[in-house]
Every structure is written in structure tokens, then in C-alpha cells.
Amino acid sequence: MAVADRLAERGLEIPPAQVIPPGVRLTYRRLVRWGDVAYIAGHGPTNGESWGSKLGKVGRELTVEEAVAAAELTALNVLGTIERELGGLDGIACWLKVNGYVNAVDGFTEQARVINGFSDLILDLYGEDRLAARTSIGVPHLPFDMPVEVDAVVALA
């Protein structure tokens, strides 16, 4: 079954591309393809021109459950970049590496649970044999006060 069909089965849609706020200059590419590998820059829980989740620290402004949902939305944004840049979602042979960053209060220890929101969607869409190695890290701040940011590396078929 095509990845787009699996998304539709779950009632999920790829959000519009992130619109960079006026006055903000970001000097990078969202995806770089080098041979049969694609490197995907850090993405957050955006929905086009707006934030698709609350902003702030997990454990203060966001509950763990809200952060898990933000991580799932981040996965949808990463998929959107892949779809726009590579022309589809079915050409991924394997998710090689995922780095998840959680903007959290001091002492927060559930980073892995939060980033499961990203990984669980990838698992549902691509299966266990294409699931990435992963790191989940707690950080004191993220750009724009995002609750989560994720970057990834995928092998292309």
C-alpha cells in the first residue's frame, strides 16, 4: 500500500510547507540529496504560516501528550518536505537516522516518549524493517521556542 494511502487511512494529511516569518533569514536547504541518501534539516510542528502546536517547554507550557502530538506533526512536516523535494513518499528504502530534540524543563526525562510521536508514525507508514536508529535529546531552548525539532537521514530506493 502506498504511503499516501496509509496516511489517508489514519485521517492524516501533509501540512502546507512552512512559511518563514517576515524578517527571519534561514540559510539552509530543507533537504539535500546526495546520491541515494537524503539529509533532511531540522523541522518543527508547523502548519504552513502558523504553528500547529503550542510553543514552549515540555513540562511547563506543554504536557507530554501535547509534545507527542507535536512530534507527530513534525513527522508530517518532514514527510511533506520529502514529498515536495523528491516527488513522492514511496521512494524511501530506509530511514537511517533520526535525531529528536525536546525543548524541556530542567529534570525532564521523557524525551524518548515525546519523540515516539515521530517514530510511531514512521513505523506505521514504513514498517519496522525501515525504521531508523534514533537519538532523543533534551535541550534548554529551540528556535522560535518550538517544543520539538527533528532532523533525519533516509536512504532512497
Located regions from the model:
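N-terminal presequence-like segments and the immediate start of the first folded domain
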Residues: 1-76, 80-98, 104-157
